[in-house]
Swiss-Prot record:
PANTHER family: RECBCD ENZYME SUBUNIT RECC. It comes from Clostridium novyi (strain NT). This is ATP-dependent helicase/deoxyribonuclease subunit B. One of its GO terms (biological process) is double-strand break repair via homologous recombination. ATP binds at G8, R9, A10, G11, S12, G13, K14, S15. Despite having conserved helicase domains, this subunit does not have helicase activity.
Length: 1134
């Protein structure tokens, strides 16, 4: 028995020496057992290297293995545990169950126990304790030695969970961490290592469990060889890059001394004859000097090493893709000789996929794929969520949209529209026939409902309350079979293979077996234990998140894309390290885990040694940098970004500054300067997709009259003559010349849309004034939003208007005068109307949930308050209602409002106004129009002038000019007013009396609008007016005169009405001309696009030449009156 160290820095040929040594031993004795032990992740590469080097029959005596495989082989030889090995998912499930049962007894972790990720954290610490050979008993024994009370409670919780885990585990299982412990006990009886020579390569450190196995190997093997990546002759302190390896050497020497193992003369590989860097003096210098202080800078220009500075990560990857594409065409470097590695593979993975696909670069991303976003996994968790969350819309359609539910996409879309429109929620509604909506689709909708609900109902019938774990798993399996999931997946796999998508085919061919394996694991762990569904779905989710799918490279000639920690090959000729930015590489360890650095230090002092703290990990990160920088044989590219995707500045890593110090003349490439399209830049020509993208940039520049090189004409010609690209090129041409301008529609089409007899509403003409295109989409094309089962502001407005209208009808029929109505009768009547209308609402939305029922009561309060205010208004006023919901139209009380266009054609305006009031005074009739508003609508003369508020003045004019209403000598305007429907909250600095509160409510609901500038008329509107009115926008000054704001003379009202008519005529004429321009109005406070539903259709963008707002400058009332006066004079002169 002997032991030999093999020393050498990175690239010195340690792995090569081991394989050569194995070949030499094999030639000396073909029967001798020769064993090479490497980390599990190195095993494939090591086996490949051994097979390539060692040939002949003796190869059968050479074994490449890992500690994990040794356990497997020894157990097969001498027998292992009688217990099954639980996988990591099963381990998480077991820990979840333990924590779930113990959480009330935990001191520190009681709250954290319910947090996502806590189970994984506990699993990690248990794994760590086992690997460092710390038992639960030993951990608990430290409690009396710990002074810090919080740490003591934390260790108490951990040891408690650890004890319960070990007890539960060892009843039936062992986990992967127990395997090495069992191997230590079993290896003595194995003959596998008897007389064998062992080489151990690629380890920088070992766990206490592995050290124990090494002790056994030293006892049984003829010789054990271990490689150590370090400089034998260098004095190494605790901060040196080789410090982790040095600590390993010291620990091994302690064991050798304790076991009295003979130490053979070490092998010291000389870096002067280094094999890996024989073709690059720059890389050899880098390996020797990167961590050397002081150092002598490399005084030559670098050819093999470059720094690439990019604008952002996307540009960073595109730069290397261009270079790889060029190198693959111009040199003998194959794709398999190239690696792209990063410390942030998650952040760069999607970018690499996108860009490498564009550049047609074959690649393999070396990572295990998570499965929790696979459609089958989503389906299973969603089905359980359906039952846990009362058949919620979200869970139901997450399930249906997986594509595995045996329901077509078209059926899912139809069903979703219906469910959203009518608020289908809950098992009861899914079981009952649906009867709302269009009868033409009800039969089809109910067929789909049954198709969806029947398997779910059958499934849920087997899961009531708590169910045994094996029963739940069996029900899940039977459900999946009942909807044909496995058959659908098989069809997908076949489809993916036919499409050449081997990666997806491989993923989906494994997923079914993975799910079955996980369900089996649940049954194994929980057996007949009863579980609630909410816990079952958590258990499943833990398992699904833990599962990782190993992928095999589909071809040999591919670029390797990997995390820096997973690069396992030394056959790389060109290495790109991307994301060399501050905080990314080297990584900054922030998460200390359940045990902080301080906790670990305290435990170490009392004899419990576990994994390194974050400070030690920082030194390990330095060693990782060393290993990474010395991976390549010939070329090295250090790549970093100066900004992220949002333009936020990023700093280069300390690695970049170190390179610039070592290599003062290092080449640094940058894409910060815009590409030159004027020169014949052949570098812009590469693969089809990226070259096409550059061509598009050229075409844009040409469109902007910027000079470009003539050679792009040849590029354009190639794409235009290529059948695969011609259509795409034409589309790009159209896009570049696109202005987003909308042409006028022909009169013929306009007539087909709106008909020859034009009936329009004033509110629609207001919409047209706001944006012609928006009007066209809504009323011409009749585009509709997807109907959602919810109360929208328009729904509420309509509901409240209807209640007030019906209340008005009841008042009229009862014979009451408004000023005679008592508060109690008002409240009872409103309440009864609201309740009845709520019951009659489509889909029963007002009674569909406790929230909506509460909202209905709130509506009652609002309406009662508003109607009581209306009653108070009318008690104070000489104006009394002569009509509610007054309609203008063929079948209405009053005929349509007729306007004549300049062509002689007549347009009929139809609609209704909420209320018309009249005052009889001295053979004159004064009329006022009142419009109820549930929002904060204010009257604006400026908006009236621009045609944005037309309704009140249009209806006032119709009333004043209607012959049927003129039973007196003269009909005059009294005013136009908005009345807000609300239940205002009154705030006061002191206790207010009931009368004061009432006054404050009246102020809050004061009507807004325009009144006739006549003191007597105003005083009739508010007979209690003193100073500022509580109910109308008017003021009586101390001298008895009328305030000037919000009033207009008879002449001004006439001019305003005339101007409104002109606005109506112009809007109608523009509409009939086919003007549907994208021309939204913009005013001081808002624009027409703010709440527009059709922005995704019009794609209005002021960057387009023809896309501009129609800006209206807000005008003061005085300015409007002056403009109207001038208009009137001009009309009179004509």
């Amino acid at each position: 028995m002997s032991f030999r160290f093999i020393y050498g820095r990175a690239g010195s040929g340690k792995s090569k020496f081991c394989i050569d040594d194995i070949e030499k031993r094999l030639q000396e004795d073909t029967n001798k057992q020769l064993i090479l032990i490497v980390p599990e992740q190195f095993s494939f590469q090591a086996e490949k290297s051994v097979v390539e080097k060692v040939k002949g029959t003796g190869i059968t005596n050479v074994k490449v293995t890992s500690f994990e495989r040794i356990a497997y082989d020894v157990f097969n030889e001498v027998g292992g545990s009688t217990h099954k090995i639980i996988n990591s998912s099963g381990k998480l499930m077991l820990i979840f169950n333990i924590i779930n049962n113990l959480k009330d007894e935990l001191k520190v972790f009681a709250t954290a126990a319910n947090q996502e990720g806590f189970v994984n954290n506990i699993s990690d610490i248990i794994t760590e304790l086992k690997r460092y050979d710390v038992t639960a008993t030993e951990l608990r024994a430290t409690l009396n030695l710990i002074e810090d009370e919080f740490l003591k409670d934390k260790i108490n919780d951990i040891s408690y969970i650890f004890e319960q885990f070990q007890e539960s585990l060892h009843k039936n299982y062992i986990d992967s961490e127990d395997e090495l412990t069992l191997l230590y006990r079993k290896i003595d009886t194995s003959k596998m290592f008897d007389g064998a020579e062992v080489w151990i390569d690629e380890f920088s450190s070992f766990t206490p469990q592995q050290y124990k196995i090494l002790e056994k190997l030293m006892e049984k093997a003829s010789r054990v060889n271990i490689t150590l990546c370090m400089d034998y002759y260098r004095v190494i302190d605790g901060t040196d890059v080789f410090a982790p390896t040095k600590r390993t050497e010291e620990k091994l020497r302690e064991i050798l001394k304790e076991k009295d193992v003979k130490l053979d003369k070490p092998i010291i590989l000389n870096n002067d004859d280094v094999n890996r860097f024989k073709d690059s003096s720059e890389l050899k210098y880098l390996e020797e000097n990167y961590f050397k202080y002081p150092y002598k800078p490399y005084d030559k220009t670098t050819d093999d090493i470059k720094i690439i500075r990019a604008l952002n990560p996307y540009s960073e990857v595109e730069n290397i893709a261009k270079e790889i594409a060029k190198i693959s065409m111009e040199s003998n470097i194959r794709y398999r000789d190239i690696a792209v590695i990063t410390r942030d593979l998650e952040g760069y993975e999607k970018i690499v996929k996108t860009i490498f696909d564009e550049y047609e670069i074959p690649y393999f991303i070396d990572k295990k794929k998570e499965i929790d976003d696979n459609p089958l996994i989503v389906l299973i968790t969603s089905v359980i969520e359906i039952f846990n969350k009362s058949w919620s819309y979200e869970a139901m359609f997450r399930y249906l949209k997986t594509g595995l539910s045996n329901v077509s996409k078209e059926e899912v879309d139809l069903l979703e529209n219906y469910v959203l429109a009518y608020g289908i929620r809950g098992k009861k509604k899914w079981q009952s026939p649906w009867e709302y909506g269009n009868e033409n689709i009800l039969e089809k909708i109910n067929e789909i409902r049954i198709k969806v609900s029947e398997p779910l109902i059958k499934f849920s019938s087997k899961l009531k309350g708590k169910s045994k774990a094996d029963e739940i798993c069996s029900a899940v399996y039977n459900f999946l079979c009942s909807i044909g999931v496995n058959e659908t997946i098989e069809k997908w796999v076949y489809k993916f293979k036919n499409e050449g998508n081997q990666a997806l085919a491989k993923e989906y061919s494994q997923i079914w077996n993975m799910v079955i394996e996980l369900l089996d694991q649940v049954v194994e762990v929980f057996k007949e234990e009863e579980l609630q569904l909410k816990d079952f779905v958590k258990i499943l989710s833990l398992g699904f998140k833990d599962y990782k799918m190993g992928l095999i490279p589909p071809s040999l000639d591919q670029v390797l894309v990997s995390d820096v920690e997973r690069v396992r090959t030394h056959e790389i000729k060109l290495l790109y390290i991307i994301g060399v930015n501050d905080g990314i590489f080297p990584a900054v360890s922030k998460d200390e885990g359940i045990l902080s650095d301080s906790d670990r230090g305290s435990l170490k002092k009392i004899g419990i040694e576990i994994a390194e703290d974050t400070k030690s990990k920082a030194f390990e990160e330095q060693y990782l940098i060393y290993r990474t920088l010395t991976t390549t044989q010939k070329y090295l590219r250090i790549c970093y970004s100066i900004a992220d995707y949002e333009g936020k500045a990023l700093r280069p890593s300390i690695i970049v500054s170190r390179f610039k110090s070592l290599f003062p003349k290092i080449a640094e490439e940058s894409d910060n300067i815009a590409m030159d399209y004027e020169e014949e830049n052949i570098d812009l020509i590469s693969r089809e997709i990226p070259t096409f993208n550059n061509l598009v940039s050229v075409l844009r520049r040409e469109d902007n009259k910027v000079k470009v090189s003539p050679f792009w004409s040849d590029v354009y010609k190639w794409y235009s003559e290529n059948p695969r690209w011609k259509e795409t090129l034409d589309t790009v041409f159209s896009a570049i010349s696109y202005t987003n301008a909308v042409d006028d529609i022909s009169e013929e089409k306009i007539r087909k849309m709106y008909g020859n007899k034009l009936y329009l509403t004033v509110s629609r003409l207001e919409k047209y004034a706001q944006c012609p295109f928006g009007y066209y989409i809504k009323y011409g094309l009749k585009a509709k939003e997807r109907k959602i089962f919810a109360l929208t502001p328009p729904d509420l407005g309509t509901f409240m208007h209807n209640v007030i209208d019906e209340f008005s009808e009841v008042v009229d029929k009862s014979g009451f005068k408004w000023y005679e109505i008592e508060d109690k009768w008002c409240k009872d009547t409103v309440s009864e109307i609201v309740d009845r209308k709520a019951e009659e609402s489509a889909g029963g939305i007002f009674t569909s949930s406790a929230r909506y029922k509460y909202f209905t009561e709130r509506l009652k309060r609002v309406l009662i308050k508003t109607i009581l205010v209306i009653i108070e208004h009318l008690k104070r006023s000489g104006f009394q209602p002569i009509g509610h919901e007054v309609g203008f139209g063929n079948d209405e009380k009053y005929p349509p409002i007729e306007i004549e266009l300049s062509s002689g054609e007549k347009v009929k305006l139809i609609g209704r106004i909420d209320r018309v009031d009249k005052l009889d005074m001295e053979k004159k009739d004064y009329y006022r129009i009142i419009d109820y508003k549930s929002g904060n609508k204010d009257f604006s003369l400026s908006d009236v002038y621009y045609g944005l508020q037309l309704q009140l003045l249009t209806y006032l004019d119709a009333i004043l000019t209607n012959e049927e209403l003129k039973d007196r000598e003269e009909a005059l305007p009294g005013g136009v007013l908005y009345l807000k429907i609300d239940d205002p909250i009154i705030k006061g600095k002191r206790n207010l009396s009931e009368e004061e509160i009432q006054d404050e409510i009246m102020k809050a609901l004061k009507m807004k609008g325009l009144l006739l500038a006549d003191e007597e008329v105003v005083k009739e509107m508010d007979r209690k007016i003193e100073g500022n009115s509580l109910i109308i926008p008017a003021r009586i000054n101390k001298d008895g005169s009328l305030g000037k704001s919000s009033v207009g003379t008879e002449e001004q009202f006439r001019l305003l009405r005339e101007h409104v008519k002109k606005n109506l005529i112009k809007a109608c004429e523009d509409m009939l001309k086919g003007d549907i321009k994208i021309r939204p109005i913009r005013s001081k406070n808002a624009d027409a696009c703010t709440y527009c539903l059709y922005s995704s259709i019009c794609e209005f963008d002021t960057n387009f030449e023809d896309n501009e707002f129609k800006v209206v400058q807000e005008k003061k009332d005085e300015e409007v009156w002056e403009l109207l006066r001038k208009e009137g004079e001009e009309s009179w002169e004509k």
